[in-house]
Amino acid sequence: LYVGDGTDLDAFCKRTGIPGLVADKEIDCEGNVLMPGFKDAHTHSAMVAMRSFADDMPLQEWLNTKIFPLEAKMTEQDNYDLTQLAILEYLTTGVTSVFDMYLSPKDIARACVDMGMRCVLVSGLNKFGPALEVMEERYLTLNRMHPLISYMLGVHAEYTCSKELLEQVSEM
């Protein structure tokens, strides 16, 4: 992408001195705004299929009686496929990067790479989730997986983390 000063794009390509640099396409954007893509800073992409599912319930009841039992039945392929569905929705609204905090981070990463979506995977650290060793392995593996993928630790919620867990994370 080159946002120029009104000079000819081919002339710009030649001026760079980079061999083989040519413009594939030139678009006159005069009178328009060119913006970077939006970033969704908190997603659970594969939950796209659960939208409006028992949404008239209090949070804890909704989680414990509806969401957690449904999630227990989801496969890795479900997470992959539903993440791809969510990515289609993101792209139609200008979202080009997500911070995904859902289950099965390797499948989310694979779906994002296959769809060309930038993703920061955030493990929702909590007292019920995987051990810190698993989190460390994910950190090392997923951060090397693909340039579109990053991994970081994140706190699920204050009510699902103990003080001891947070202290252990700070020592990592």
What residue spans do the PLM features occupy?
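Short, ordered loop/turn segments at secondary-structure junctions
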Residues: 6, 103, 124-125
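Divalent metal-coordination and catalytic microenvironments
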Residues: 31, 42, 50, 94, ...
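Metal-coordinating catalytic core of metallo-dependent amide/deamination hydrolases
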Residues: 108-172
